[in-house]
Amino acid sequence: MKNLATKFENLTIQNDFIFKKVMSRKRICIHLLEELLQIKITDINYLEAEKSLEPEYTSRGIRLDIIVADDRNTHYNLEMQVKNNKNPDTKKHVLPKRTRYYQALLDIDLLQNSQEYDLLPPTYVIFICVFDFFAKGNYVYTFKKRCLEDLELELPDEATTIILNTQGTHGNISKDIKSFYD
């Protein structure tokens, strides 16, 4: 029993179980989102913890860690990523395409049949990575779609992907986000 207690004491936020337990605390989840996005959130609803999505029988299914919606109907998917996986066949890192797939599947349940597309709520897919995928040293990498011919022109689809880098060395993050990393 002592080994089990020692093993449990050594778990960190990087552990799937601990991450879900911590993020299931409403106050902590709200605070993390507020600090990261520099917004005020009054309340959140947990839509599902570890939601499994399999859009078609032959499609690749996924399991989303934490999905919440705030009081303005903005939807957030929070993921802890401890491995910088590569496709064994192509040797390419999978994180960029994984974020794209997660964003698409997050949207899949947000519209009912015959609802107009403009009713899609804003969404954030947030990957908390214990590695610096881009090797640039940023604490935060935020992505939105931009026009290549006019980089000032952003596609207003309200879909944002954020990759947090716990190994970051520069950029503006709050002390609370930094302590969350530690």
Annotated model-derived regions:
Residues M1-D182:
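Elongated, amphipathic alpha-helical interaction scaffolds
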